[in-house]
């Protein structure tokens, strides 16, 4: 069992508004494409943040991708470029890791893959890890998006800084 879902380094960041354009790589594994689509739908249903799926990567703020890396002990990854002056994201790439998520020995159900996608998209929104019951727990991917996660996004995007 992985000790944590990802190795997110906390870089303060958020978008100028509570929405971003996301490109889902079409050559990606269908299971991962489906998991991202479901995670996007679930975040959009909260009303706190809107992901707009775009067909052209050059139009995207966020790229949803995949990796297959056993040298890292993470099921997913979010890499962000942030403008250090404005503290706003320039771009974010999220990745789901086949090495763990697609390996039956690690026992990831489809639901947990969706939760991992929700977690990485949470980082792409600007959320950090929390030890509360939350989709942003560092480990496990047993939780989907919780009311506290919606509240955290609302607070992030209503704060003036």
Segments from the language model and where they lie:
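Zinc-dependent metalloendopeptidases
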Residues: 1-161
């Amino acid at each position: 069992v992985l000790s944590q879902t990802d190795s997110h380094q906390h870089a303060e960041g958020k978008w100028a508004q509570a929405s971003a354009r996301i490109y889902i790589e079409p050559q990606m594994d269908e299971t991962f494409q489906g998991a991202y689509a479901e995670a996007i739908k679930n975040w959009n249903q909260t009303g706190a943040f809107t992901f707009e799926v775009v067909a052209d990567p050059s139009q995207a703020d966020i790229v949803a991708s995949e990796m297959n890396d056993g040298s890292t002990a993470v099921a997913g990854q979010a890499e962000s470029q942030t403008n250090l002056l404005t503290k706003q994201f320039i771009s974010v790439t999220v990745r789901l890791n086949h090495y763990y998520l697609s390996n039956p020995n690690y026992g990831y159900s489809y639901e947990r893959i969706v939760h991992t996608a929700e977690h990485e998209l949470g980082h792409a929104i600007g959320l950090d890890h929390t030890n509360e019951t939350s989709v942003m727990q560092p480990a496990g991917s047993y939780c989907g998006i919780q009311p506290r996660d919606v509240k955290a996004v609302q607070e992030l995007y209503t704060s003036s800084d």
